[in-house]
From Swiss-Prot:
<keyword id="KW-0997">Cell inner membrane</keyword>
<keyword id="KW-1003">Cell membrane</keyword>
<comment type="function">
    <text>Cell division protein that is involved in the assembly of the Z ring. May serve as a membrane anchor for the Z ring.</text>
</comment>
<keyword id="KW-0472">Membrane</keyword>
<dbReference type="GO" id="GO:0009898">
    <property type="term" value="C:cytoplasmic side of plasma membrane"/>
</dbReference>
<dbReference type="InterPro" id="IPR050696">
    <property type="entry name" value="FtsA/MreB"/>
</dbReference>
<dbReference type="Pfam" id="PF02491">
    <property type="entry name" value="SHS2_FTSA"/>
</dbReference>
<protein>
    <recommendedName>
        <fullName>Cell division protein FtsA</fullName>
    </recommendedName>
</protein>
<dbReference type="InterPro" id="IPR043129">
    <property type="entry name" value="ATPase_NBD"/>
</dbReference>
<dbReference type="GO" id="GO:0051301">
    <property type="term" value="P:cell division"/>
</dbReference>
<comment type="similarity">
    <text>Belongs to the FtsA/MreB family.</text>
</comment>
<keyword id="KW-0131">Cell cycle</keyword>
<keyword id="KW-0132">Cell division</keyword>
<dbReference type="GO" id="GO:0043093">
    <property type="term" value="P:FtsZ-dependent cytokinesis"/>
</dbReference>
<comment type="subunit">
    <text>Self-interacts. Interacts with FtsZ.</text>
</comment>
<dbReference type="Pfam" id="PF14450">
    <property type="entry name" value="FtsA"/>
</dbReference>
<dbReference type="InterPro" id="IPR020823">
    <property type="entry name" value="Cell_div_FtsA"/>
</dbReference>
Length: 414
């Protein structure tokens, strides 16, 4: 009897793009990426939905393209979320161990106790991530099941979000005929994809610079300790270039991606770049030194906000023994690692997702870190979910027609 294929699917709904990935889970729980779709995102600002219809259309297009490539239809997704409405805090729950030996039921009760906190009425708990356990006086326990004791403490990192903001994201997903089985904070997903266990143990901060937000996650002693979402990202750099160079936004985005340099100290500056004019105005030549000055000012501002956030969190840069890991689209910019090392006075590297099978070569860039981390999270949840249908893929409403979808699939594939 032929074994049923096991699929997982994720949605990374960002300010600049919506990305859908479909993975096939192998017998050894390794993931082959078999479907990829992406669409420009015009219905979000700083990670929050501002236009339901535009967001729905982008999700449909991305999902349709991923389904066509994978030749399967998905019904359930794991979704990444960000936005300046996100809050986080650390909490602790305590329970008596029943029968003197820790069971999963004891752990569940301890986590629920930790979640019994006062939060603003307009916020809801999105996730509670276990940091470690304490059994009686034994600290730093990571796998407590089966251990003997009287009292179980669990320390958790709790993430909350604005109820209406979360509902708007879920509404967009449901209008596409999908169910979101879990919502995961985007910096947690990025950390899952790009960090090593040694970095998490020593102390590290992952900085994911996306289009609309800069997301940070601090790990220490193997667990998440602090998360934050800063409402500033690569789109501000694009707007800075557009205003300073008096060029359309699309042209500014192209210039940022192809010629952008993060620091004025980068070697080889001086190349002349053609900058299109607005409307019928003629284009002109601008030195890459000018671009670097515009871009570095904004990046320095973003890194300054990150430094302040780390200081407020109780995890200043001095405790980050493994340094900084940059990821997200902006982290691919020339000179940004050296610029970050100068500002943070820490070792810095660019983080790309770990290798997977299937379309791995296509997605092993920092732009896909969040989506790959979401795939890992979806894989852990996968056992209890209904599976998608193989074979002919029915088109979702608003998908743009079969020919349009086929054209996008070819563009994504080659």
């Amino acid at each position: 009897m032929e074994q049923q294929q096991r699929y997982i699917s994720v949605l990374d709904i960002g300010t600049s793009k919506v990305l859908a990935l479909i993975g096939e889970v192998q017998d050894d729980d390794k993931i082959n990426i078999v479907g990829l779709g992406q669409a420009p995102s015009r219905g979000l600002r700083a990670g929050m939905v501002t236009n339901i219809d535009a967001t729905v259309q982008a999700i449909r297009q991305a999902v349709n393209d991923a389904e066509l490539m994978a030749d399967t239809k998905i019904t359930h997704v794991t979704t990444g979320i960000a936005g300046n409405h996100i809050r986080s805090l650390n909490s602790q729950g305590v329970v008596k161990i029943k029968d003197g030996e820790v069971t999963q039921a004891d752990i569940d009760r301890a986590i629920e106790t930790a979640k019994a906190i006062n939060i603003p009425p307009d916020q809801k708990i999105l996730d509670a991530v276990v940091q470690d356990y304490i059994i009686d006086t034994q600290l730093g326990v990571r796998e407590p099941i089966g251990m003997s004791g009287v009292r179980l403490d669990t320390r958790v990192h709790i993430i909350t979000g604005a109820s209406t903001a979360v509902q708007n994201v879920q509404k967009c997903i449901e209008r596409c005929g999908l169910k979101s089985d879990q919502i995961m904070l985007q910096p947690l997903a990025s950390g899952q994809a790009v960090l090593t266990e040694d970095e998490k143990d020593l102390g590290v901060c992952v900085i994911d610079i996306g289009g609309g937000t800069t997301d940070i996650a601090v790990y220490m002693n193997g667990a998440i300790r602090h998360t934050s979402v800063i409402p500033a990202g690569g789109n501000l750099i694009t707007k800075d270039l557009s205003k300073s160079l008096r060029t359309p936004l699309d042209a500014a985005e192209y210039i940022k991606i192809h010629y952008g340099v993060a620091s004025c100290d980068t070697e080889g500056l001086g190349e002349m770049i053609e900058v299109p004019g607005v409307g019928d105005r003629t284009s002109r030549q601008v030195s890459s030194k000018v671009l670097a000055a515009i871009i570095s000012a904004r990046i320095q501002e973003i890194f300054g906000v990150v430094l302040g956030e780390l200081q407020k969190s109780g995890f200043p840069k001095e405790v980050l023994n493994a340094g900084i890991v940059l990821t997200g689209g902006v982290s691919m910019m020339t000179g940004i690692v050296e610029f970050a090392e100068k500002i943070f006075d820490l070792p810095v590297r660019t983080g790309a997702p770990q290798e997977m099978g299937g379309l791995s070569d296509r997605v092993r860039t920092p732009r896909f870190s969040t989506a790959i981390g979401l795939l890992h999270a979806a894989c852990k949840l996968e056992g209890n979910l209904p599976q998608p249908e193989n074979g002919a893929v029915q088109e979702r409403e608003g998908g743009g027609g079969l020919l349009a979808r086929l054209k996008r699939w070819i563009e994504n594939s080659f």
